Amino acid sequence: MTKQLLTQKYTNDVQQNSQKHFGYLTERMYSYRDKVLDKKPFIDAERAILVTEAYQKHQEKPNVLKRAYMLQNILEKMTIYIDDETMIVGNQASSDKDAPIFPEYTLEFVVNELDLFEKRDGDVFYITEETKEQIRNIAPFWENNNLRARAGVMLPEEVQVYMETGFFGMEGKMNSGDAHLAVNYQKLLEEGLIGFEKKARKAKADLDLTKPESIDKYHFYDSILITIEAVKTYAERFAILAKKQAKTANAKRRQELLDIASICEQVPYYPAKTFAEAVQSVWFIQCILQIESNGHSLSYGRFDQYMYPYVKADLEAGRETEDSIVERLTNLWIKTITINKVRSQAHTFSSAGSPLYQNVTIGGQTRHKEDAVNPLSFLVLKSVAQTHLPQPNLTVRYHANLDKSFMNEAIEVMKLGFGMPAFNNDEIIIPSFIKKGVSEEDAYDYSAIGCVETAVPGKWGYRCTGMSYINFPKVLLITMNNGIDPASGKRFAPSYGHFTQMTSYKELKEAWDKTLRYLTRMSVIVENAIDISLEREVPDILCSALTDNCIGRGKHLKEGGAVYDYISGLQVGIANLSDSLAALKKLVFEEKRLTTLEVWQALQSDYAGPRGEEIRQMLINEAPKYGNDDDYADSLVRECYDVYVEEIAKYPNTRYGRGPIGGIRYSGTSSISANVGQGRGTLATPDGRHAGTPLAEGCSPSHNMDKKGPTSVLKSVSKLPTDEIVGGVLLNQKVNPQTLAKEEDKQKLIALLRTFFNRLHGYHIQYNVVSRETLIDAQKHPEKHRDLIVRVAGYSAFFNVLSKATQDDIIARTEHAL
């Protein structure tokens, strides 16, 4: 039955054959997967009520203690449950896939959208009248009393215009925690929370309280001790519940529940001794971190590296078989999909599909520069293939000597058509990290975080990626309009001349440089103001305790407790910028086939009028395009992008000089689905794009402008300064499943990837292996495609939960042949 049901989600023989290769879920895990996916996501007010209780009771205490008591109150009182099918326990909300509310960050959008959650075009949530009433009851306490309110007043007057118009896309950052990191799971498994507790106690005892800085450290250490005890209590509650359920269970389930109880009495407080304990310990923390904070991209790190010793020992001792390990892994991945987050309607435009970006990284190299692939690496691939879910977000670290059979298996998973794994390239990422100040040993130990971002797990500060999303095409329009945003009519930058008065491309380029530098500075001001607010208002204690060197310094993450602290700025619409510049330079300034006035009027009318469409077709068809290995277009965007790389590096982050190595900014192109949201507010652009339509995502070419095949795309991307875009270079590609039908086709793709990574120094690539026809049919008949998963940007999502605008954007992507 399982085999029959699981193959129904595939529409072609290629994917069915790949599924046969990896095998199928066990009956219990298939049942569990089905149960979770069938569950409607509801808004859950329980956490919000418990947070309100704690904040009211501990109002006078320092924020680190208030946050510790908050988590304690939640973990001691929240609803817990153990599903019949699961071997792993721990829940984020009152029911699977329900979304808890985080009023200490914001409650404003929740209250405003109470009657709208079920009416959304995408990212729909359900809500009961009782929950609405509960939220309304606590709302007065949080009015002007949370992160969003305080961050809002922290913003200087000079940047208010960008917030009012949504230019920087800061909705997520003002409503959420930071996250974007992986804690030190290896140390957790080896030492248990008791090890962190001992360090905090010793550090507290060693303080000289006559030193002013020791007072804050004293309270920070106390908050860690309270938090660790709360986590211990949470695990013990599950041990008690498991024993209770065992009394009425059948013999087989009774023993399993008693085993669960024993495991929960051991971890995460004490070190893990077995694979089952290690998985449970990691899941407890992964889950609780997302109860403590609503920041996303809390990633598992290098799962196959820190977990393999337990797998190896259990296999050798006969405690586990490969099949039992795979089943427990599939259980973990299904638990991972139960975590949920509700975003404001505005935020969903840049994070479509309710993603949590919980990344698992496998492969790569060891700290000693050897191939890190081990037997667990293969089992992770197999388990992810069997579960066929958008979470976890699976990344393979590629390097020149990567095990060939492992690479083959990774491509087999990719053929299943759910957008995984993505590939990150050691050959460019490791040298880039070392260049920025990361030790060689740590650079070799990096993992993917969230989408395509990278960091050293357990040693990196919050938010290795930016959140301001500088809209490059809109910056160009502002540049052309003498510093005024043509959409809002508001001044965004100083006057550097109007496009209609320019007589050369050089003038336009000089104005671009000045405008981009100015707006980059403004984005830094916005991010700093919000970062300061995050530091003061919502310190995350558990997350800090599990990140080196927070206990050693006596500082939480936002104060500069981590070993490293780098963040990136993000950009949207790189390809639109390239194609626009190429069209303007060639058709206006070089060939003079169009005047500046004609182009400007066409843009302002969205290509309406007598010559509007004619001009649009000229811009589209008669100028070079990025993605075709054309130096004309590729060099223009490189020149303009270099300005951003140079400018963003000038500005340290708020942790600079406070302990961590780094404290600086660099570039990144991981724009997730912001290309759709940002496109909504961007007028027509000189590449022929209509107003309000999506921009190009990541560093991928504009849809259907890449005419010369995948190799040309890779060559164009490689001309970007990838060694400086350390925050991630997001490249999406799409191929028809039939393109990979034969073994020789798969080997062609592997050869293409090796060329991209070894010779062209590509940073990242990911594939949608799905046909346009399947996507169109899924849009028309969603009930037939419940399991259809697509790669949106640096993450995958169920196609049916996406808004129509995001679905259309994915359908429109170029479909390549090899």
Regions found by a protein language model. Give the residues of each.
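Extended non-globular scaffold/tether segments
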Residues: 222-236
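Heptad-repeat amphipathic alpha-helical coiled-coil interaction surface used
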Residues: 204, 232, 239, 243-246, ...
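Structural signal for well-ordered, non-membrane alpha-helices
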Residues: 236-239, 243, 524, 645
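Conserved catalytic cores of very large enzyme subunits
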Residues: 2-221, 252-259, 270-818
